[in-house]
Amino acid sequence: TVIVPLSARAALRAIDTLCERLGRAIPVMVSGTLADASGRTLSGQTVEAFYASVAHARPLSVGLNCAYGAKQLLPYLERLAAVAETRISTPPNAGLPNIMGGYDETPAMFAADCAEYMRRGLVDIIGGCCGTTPEHIFELAKIAGDYAPRRLPAPRHITVLSGLEPLRIVPEANFVNIGERTNVAGSA
């Protein structure tokens, strides 16, 4: 799990280097944490830009976790599912922390909220993060088998660049000028 996507990119590069040395692939799951209700990472990336920034590594899954309970994470998983060509993983929290730093969401409440992800076909791999207990995971496991994994979309074969927002370069765009007039000394 990463809070800053640049950390994920550095880790993915290190894993890639290790795989080259070992002569074999290692399955990698990348999970990001959103900083607040804006749905952005701590560095300001949208969910879509976060996916674009790690997709080149072809991870086993890309996901979101922590920071939110299962109910609050739902709209961001929908956005991730709309762009992800990989498996999607998520271990949400057992709700949001209470004033004492504990988590009040019961195992049954947690499982019911997570069932919505599976019912909508948004995730392939699911678990629990902050505040979850073996009982939370037990309740989740009891219902997970009732749902099919998410259907992977057909590859789109388009270039997607990531900054704070994704930039999709599609044939209909004709010409895309990137970085023009970013020179602070001026540009003719």
Model feature map: region roles:
Residues T1-A188:
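Domain-level signal for soluble alpha/beta catalytic cores
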